[in-house]
Curated annotation (Swiss-Prot):
Membrane spanning stretches: none
Family note: Belongs to the anthranilate synthase component I family.
Matches recorded under InterPro entries: ADC_synthase, Anth_synth_I-like, Anth_synth_I_N, Anth_synth_I_PabB, Chorismate_C
Regulation: Feedback inhibition by tryptophan.
Transit peptide region: 1-34
Subcellular location, record wording: Plastid, Chloroplast
Pathway membership: Amino-acid biosynthesis; L-tryptophan biosynthesis; L-tryptophan from chorismate: step 1/5
Name of this chain's protein: Anthranilate synthase alpha subunit 1, chloroplastic
Molecular functions (GO terms): anthranilate synthase activity
Top EC class for this record: lyase
Gene3D superfamilies: Anthranilate synthase
Length: 577
């Protein structure tokens, strides 16, 4: 992930989780640190900030940033998130984005981590029913929308954000949330209508977006933290009032990060071999025999010329007393990836370690990165090299990858200027914690009459999770899988106030529904009471003409078991202690 500009170009914090939690800093030190934060702008700097703010408003900017830059050696992104969101507030919309960037030689810690909480506005869509909540204006409206994606786009069209120097090259504020796989039904209304969708057994939103005015960005290279508050001028009677209120809101945000009563994070030791698969997952949305029958049916469609490929998935279920945030902390160790995310949304919590972009738009350049073709990592650099050549000589995997590159070119071409679509990189091998993937990069220049939302609509869902031809493959997925996919194989990420977009593909993503259940268990010990959570781990396999049903089923099991290792680690570290 080269940029979460939006930039989920964020990174796991490098300090140990136990440090920076305030346990080694007395009350006096905390107060001193807090005071230093508020006094870092002298009178001249304050006047300059106010002058730039008012000048921006006079020029027509109606959403303007105020920011402070502080030392980050007393905080980690994980701790900062816990400062902003209480441990027991698991339904409060909020997020933590981090990243480990991949390359041909291995991994590098991404430069930025981004934390956000308390969105000023939310949009929740379920089929065509949309609820818009403006928490700042204390208003709520419900409406029918043929295409709910047009609502955040229309709201953004009213904004003229001020561009100021000193903001990091990362996501600094805007929309954050998820788009389910089923949002394709807003576009393909005739062939994939909601009325013909499979069973919706979880009743999760199809879209959830929060508008985050308060953002904390960790710069792991320069060892500092940017604390940012965006001011909506239209919510105030005057520019002076807007500036004063914005300044107070920013200081309140800083105060929460430097609270005297800094929350503590549960310490833990890594007792498991994180490179191994997790325990076998027994409960699935499809039995082994049903999945194998679906593979056979898919191959019949392929041999008949109906499709070339289809991705068939199944949803596994696991129950755990580990908290979703504890699972996220474990996942950072088990499977560091370009798009690490802990996202509390309406109806569910997403814990993700996605390796793949769904779509990115940065300064009107569209990026699509098909990731298809997989082989395990070697135990040494020499073995990695041997396995890399083995992967690139696998005709089946390479042919499948080229087909998906063509799909990516088609998706980008729908919204790009004529002649601007390019394959920047073709058939590169990227190394991840457990596997290597074949990767390509497709780019294009967004047409002048379109926005990033159009690029997202054209891409969602990508061919690597649906098939080819895409729409026909999705019709067969509806028939064969039997359940709505929800967040799996959709996307999560954000759209900045500047109109840049970075959306990750929701693979290697655990979904924790937050709705109440009648069969939830509780564990009571001397230390605490724990609630049982249901974790959904969904995985799929690309079916082609020579696919073997047993192998494809095992691929699903392996992918889900790799993700389940994070739950194993969270349980052994935080629950079994």
């Amino acid at each position: 992930m080269a940029s979460l500009v939006l930039s989920l170009r964020i990174a796991p914090s490098t300090p140990p989780l136990g440090l920076g939690g305030g346990r080694f800093r007395g009350r006096r030190g905390a107060v001193a640190c807090r005071a230093a934060t508020f006094q870092q702008l002298d009178a001249v700097a304050v006047r300059e900030e106010e002058s730039k703010f008012k000048a921006g408003a006079a020029e027509g900017c109606n959403i303007l940033p105020l920011k402070r830059c502080i030392f980050s050696d007393h905080l980690t992104p994980v701790l900062a998130y816990r400062c902003l969101v209480r441990e027991d507030d698991r339904e409060a919309p909020s997020f933590l984005f981090e990243s480990v960037e991949q390359g041909s030689e291995g991994t590098n810690v991404g430069r930025y981590s981004v934390v956000g909480a308390q969105p000023a506005m939310e949009i929740v869509a379920k089929a065509n029913h949309v609820t818009v909540m403006d928490h700042k204006m204390k208003s709520r409206r419900e409406q029918f929308a043929p295409d709910p994606m047009k609502i955040p786009r229309s709201i953004m069209e009213q904004w003229n954000p001020q561009i100021v120097e000193g903001l990091p090259d990362a996501f600094c504020g805007g929309w954050v949330g998820f788009f389910s796989y089923d949002t394709v039904r807003y576009v393909e209304t005739k062939k994939l209508p909601f009325s013909n969708a499979p069973e919706d057994d979880r009743n999760l939103p199809d879209i959830h977006l929060g508008l985050y005015n308060d953002i904390v960005v960790f710069d792991h290279v320069e060892k500092k933290t940017h604390v940012i508050h965006w001011v909506r001028v239209d919510c105030h009677e005057s520019v002076d009032e807007a500036y004063e209120d914005g300044k107070n809101q920013l200081e309140a945000l800083l105060s929460r990060l430097h609270s005297v009563n800094v929350p503590t994070l549960t310490a833990g030791s890594v007792k498991l071999n994180v490179g191994q698969f997790g325990s076998a997952l027994q409960k699935s949305s499809m039995s082994r025999e049903d999945y194998k029958k679906a593979v056979v049916q898919a191959k019949e469609h392929i041999l008949a010329g109906d499709i070339f490929q289809v991705v068939l998935s199944q949803r596994f279920e696991r129950r755990t007393f580990a908290d979703p945030f504890e699972v996220y902390r474990a996942l950072r160790i088990v499977n560091p990836s370009p798009y690490m995310a802990y996202l509390q949304a309406r109806g569910c919590i997403l814990v993700a370690s996605s390796p793949e972009i769904l779509t990115r738009v940065e300064k009107r350049t569209i990026v699509n990165r098909p990731l298809a073709g997989t082989i395990r990592r070697g135990k040494s650099k020499a073995e990695d090299k041997v396995l890399e050549q083995l992967l690139l000589s696998d005709e089946k995997q390479c042919a499948e990858h080229i087909m998906l590159v063509d799909l990516g070119r088609n998706d980008v071409g729908k919204v790009s200027k004529p002649g601007s679509v390019k394959v920047e990189k073709l058939m590169n091998v990227e190394r991840y914690s457990h596997v290597m993937h074949i990767s390509s990069t497709v780019t294009g220049e967004l047409r002048d009459d379109l926005t990033c939302w159009d690029a997202l609509r054209a891409a969602l869902p990508v061919g690597t999770v649906s098939g080819a031809p895409k729409v026909r493959a999705m019709e067969l997925i509806d028939q064969m899988e039997g359940k709505m996919r929800g967040p799996y194989s959709g996307g999560f990420g954000g759209v900045s106030f500047r109109g840049d977009m970075d959306i990750a593909l929701a693979l290697r993503t655990i979904v924790f529904p937050t709705g109440s259940r009648f069969d939830t268990m509780y564990s009571y010990t001397d230390k605490n009471a724990r609630q049982e959570w249901v974790a959904h781990l969904q995985a799929g396999a690309g079916i082609v003409a020579d696919s073997k049903p047993d192998d494809e089923h095992q691929e699903c099991l392996n992918k889900a078991a790799g993700l389940a290792r994070a739950i194993d680690l969270a349980e052994s570290t935080f629950v079994d202690e």
